[in-house]
Regions:
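Charged interaction scaffolds used for protein-protein
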Residues: 1-101
Length: 101
């Protein structure tokens, strides 16, 4: 059986910024941002963002699909809500998101 090794693709500065946008939006959606006081409306807006045209455009630039990002978000959300992962593990997963894109 062969082992699959995940390697980080070399990313352009633009791609790094786009990945950071997705990561920050996920942190906001999960209320992980400690440096900002987000209102519930802003948190809900972050949660809804993954199903918007803006997200689709960013995904296209990154060579992935919006559906893939939504599935990643939904999977993390389910694991976090059911206690399978804690806040620290969730934050770690979001920071390593580029490995999944």
């Amino acid at each position: 059986m062969e082992k699959v090794i995940n390697q980080i693709k070399p990313r352009t500065p633009e791609e790094k910024i786009l990945i950071a946008i997705i990561q920050q939006t996920m942190e906001d959606a999960f209320e992980l941002s400690k440096s900002t006081n987000l209102s519930m409306a802003e948190i809900q807006q972050s949660r809804n963002w993954f199903r918007t045209k803006a997200c689709e455009i960013i995904c296209d630039h990154l060579g992935t699909t919006q559906d893939h990002i939504v599935k990643l978000y939904d999977k993390l959300s389910e694991k976090y809500k059911t206690g399978q992962i804690n806040q620290t593990q969730l934050r770690f997963a979001i920071r390593r998101l580029e490995l999944k894109i």
